[in-house]
Amino acid sequence: MKIKTRFAPSPTGYLHVGGARTALYSWLFARNHGGEFVLRIEDTDLERSTPEAIEAIMDGMNWLSLEWDEGPYYQTKRFDRYNAVIDQMLEEGTAYKCYCSKERLEALREEQMAKGEKPRYDGRCRHSHEHHADDEPCVVRFANPQEGSVVFDDQIRGPIEFSNQELDDLIIRRTDGSPTYNFCVVVDDWDMEITHVIRGEDHINNTPRQINILKALKAPVPVYAHVSMINGDDGKKLSKRHGAVSVMQYRDDGYLPEALLNYLVRLGWSHGDQEIFTREEMIKYFTLNAVSKSASAFNTDKLLWLNHHYINALPPEYVATHLQWHIEQENIDTRNGPQLADLVKLLGERCKTLKEMSQSCRYFYEDFAEFDADAAKKHLRPVARQPLEVVRDKLAAITDWTAENVHHAIQATADELEVGMGKVGMPLRVAVTGAGQSPALDVTVHAIGKTRSIERINKALDFIAERENQQ
C-alpha cells in the first residue's frame, strides 16, 4: 500500500507554528515510508478565506522546503463533486433533507439545555413523510447510525471510542447549497486516497462523524493520528506573546528554516536524547509512536540556541543566501566589501539571528557618519593618537593584505610603544568600526579593507584633534 498523507490548512490566516509542525509531521511520515504528501486548501469558509492567506501558507511551506507531491487542491473548485456525492447519498437513504426552521432548532436547543441534556438534533425530519415543494429551503443531514459505537486506533493516543448515540445527524449541505467542512474533508480524503490523516487534537471530535460518513460511502477509512497542542512556556495556550506568529515572521526575525524545522520536530517528538537533526535524519527516524500525547511548551530561547547553531554549522555560502534578504531589508550595498559568506564566518559567533547580523555589518560596506559617543569618549582620547598613527603607518606598509599580517602590524605597534595590545586595539576598533564591539580585530580590519581602514583611522585622528582643540 502506498502511504499518502495530506496537509489541509484553512486559509483564514497565516501559517502558524502549530500548522507548520502538523505539516512537517505529515511530510516526514510520507517521506519516511516513500509515500506522497498532498497539499489541500480547505477554503469552504468563503467569508474568512483570503488569497493573501493562501499565499502566506504557500510562502511558509516553500521557505521550509516542505515540497508537496500533489496539489494544491482547492475545496471551492470541487463543489460539483461534493454535491454529486450528496445527491447519491440522498438516493441511497444515507442522507435526508431537513426542513426544520431556525426557530424550531433554537427552541429545541433551549429545551434540551434546560433539562441538562447535550444540545443535538432530534431527527424529526429523518422520520418525516411530509411532502415539501422542490424549492422549499432545506439543509441535507447525514443519517448517522443510531446504535453501536465508532472505535479508531489513534496512532498517537491509542484506541478512542465514541457512542453513536452521542452523535446527532450532521448537516452536510447548507440551505444555500454549499457543502459543509466535515463532509468535504471526507470526500477529499476518499478521492485523494489519503491513507494517514495526521492533524491537531482539536479534530478528534470530528473523526467519528467522518468515519461514519466514509463507511456509508463504502470508502476506505484512513489511519488517524492526532497531535497535541502547543502551549507557551507558562503552560497556557500558545498566543502571539509566546511566539505564535507566522512562519514567515520567523524568517523576518532572522531564523533559518533548518533551525525552525529542527525545533518543531522536537516539539512533541523525540529520538533518544538527540537534539540536532538534519532533514535526512528527521526522515530516517520519524515515527508516530514516538510522538508525545502531552502538550508541548514553546521555548523561544531553545529556538534561538538552535538558530545560532545552524548559522555556524551550515555552509557559510548557504547561510549567505538567506542573509541576502535581510541585507536588502537594511538597504546595504554590499558591492564594496566582503562577500556575504565571509561575513557569516566573521559574525556567526556573535550573532544569533540573521537579522542581528544584517544590523551589525553596515560598517563593513559603508562609512559611518559618526563614532559611538560612549566608545569615542572612552577610547578616542589624546593618548590614543600615537598608537593610531603608528598602526596606520604599519598597515599602510603591508603589501600582502591578510588577517595575519594585520595582526602582526597591531602586535608590532604595541611592542614598539611598549604598551598592551588593548592600548592599540581598542582605539583602532573604534576608529575602523565606529563602535566598541566587533569580531576579532585582525579579521575585522582585513575585511574592511586596507584603503578604507586607513581612511577611517585618519578620521579618528581628526576627531581626536578636534577634541583636543575644544579642551
Curated annotation (Swiss-Prot):
<keyword id="KW-0030">Aminoacyl-tRNA synthetase</keyword>
<dbReference type="GO" id="GO:0008270">
    <property type="term" value="F:zinc ion binding"/>
</dbReference>
<dbReference type="GO" id="GO:0005524">
    <property type="term" value="F:ATP binding"/>
</dbReference>
<feature type="short sequence motif" description="'HIGH' region">
    <location>
        <begin position="9"/>
        <end position="19"/>
    </location>
</feature>
<dbReference type="GO" id="GO:0005829">
    <property type="term" value="C:cytosol"/>
</dbReference>
<keyword id="KW-0963">Cytoplasm</keyword>
<keyword id="KW-0479">Metal-binding</keyword>
<dbReference type="InterPro" id="IPR000924">
    <property type="entry name" value="Glu/Gln-tRNA-synth"/>
</dbReference>
<comment type="function">
    <text>Catalyzes the attachment of glutamate to tRNA(Glu) in a two-step reaction: glutamate is first activated by ATP to form Glu-AMP and then transferred to the acceptor end of tRNA(Glu).</text>
</comment>
<keyword id="KW-0862">Zinc</keyword>
<feature type="binding site">
    <location>
        <position position="240"/>
    </location>
    <ligand>
        <name>ATP</name>
    </ligand>
</feature>
<dbReference type="Pfam" id="PF19269">
    <property type="entry name" value="Anticodon_2"/>
</dbReference>
<feature type="binding site">
    <location>
        <position position="98"/>
    </location>
    <ligand>
        <name>Zn(2+)</name>
    </ligand>
</feature>
<dbReference type="GO" id="GO:0006424">
    <property type="term" value="P:glutamyl-tRNA aminoacylation"/>
</dbReference>
<dbReference type="InterPro" id="IPR020058">
    <property type="entry name" value="Glu/Gln-tRNA-synth_Ib_cat-dom"/>
</dbReference>
<dbReference type="Pfam" id="PF00749">
    <property type="entry name" value="tRNA-synt_1c"/>
</dbReference>
<dbReference type="GO" id="GO:0000049">
    <property type="term" value="F:tRNA binding"/>
</dbReference>
<dbReference type="InterPro" id="IPR045462">
    <property type="entry name" value="aa-tRNA-synth_I_cd-bd"/>
</dbReference>
<comment type="similarity">
    <text>Belongs to the class-I aminoacyl-tRNA synthetase family. Glutamate--tRNA ligase type 1 subfamily.</text>
</comment>
<dbReference type="InterPro" id="IPR049940">
    <property type="entry name" value="GluQ/Sye"/>
</dbReference>
<dbReference type="InterPro" id="IPR014729">
    <property type="entry name" value="Rossmann-like_a/b/a_fold"/>
</dbReference>
<feature type="short sequence motif" description="'KMSKS' region">
    <location>
        <begin position="237"/>
        <end position="241"/>
    </location>
</feature>
<protein>
    <recommendedName>
        <fullName>Glutamate--tRNA ligase</fullName>
        <ecNumber>6.1.1.17</ecNumber>
    </recommendedName>
</protein>
<dbReference type="InterPro" id="IPR004527">
    <property type="entry name" value="Glu-tRNA-ligase_bac/mito"/>
</dbReference>
<keyword id="KW-0436">Ligase</keyword>
<dbReference type="InterPro" id="IPR001412">
    <property type="entry name" value="aa-tRNA-synth_I_CS"/>
</dbReference>
<dbReference type="GO" id="GO:0004818">
    <property type="term" value="F:glutamate-tRNA ligase activity"/>
</dbReference>
<keyword id="KW-0067">ATP-binding</keyword>
<dbReference type="InterPro" id="IPR033910">
    <property type="entry name" value="GluRS_core"/>
</dbReference>
<feature type="binding site">
    <location>
        <position position="127"/>
    </location>
    <ligand>
        <name>Zn(2+)</name>
    </ligand>
</feature>
<dbReference type="InterPro" id="IPR020751">
    <property type="entry name" value="aa-tRNA-synth_I_codon-bd_sub2"/>
</dbReference>
<keyword id="KW-0547">Nucleotide-binding</keyword>
<keyword id="KW-0648">Protein biosynthesis</keyword>
<feature type="binding site">
    <location>
        <position position="100"/>
    </location>
    <ligand>
        <name>Zn(2+)</name>
    </ligand>
</feature>
<comment type="subunit">
    <text>Monomer.</text>
</comment>
<feature type="binding site">
    <location>
        <position position="125"/>
    </location>
    <ligand>
        <name>Zn(2+)</name>
    </ligand>
</feature>
<dbReference type="InterPro" id="IPR008925">
    <property type="entry name" value="aa_tRNA-synth_I_cd-bd_sf"/>
</dbReference>
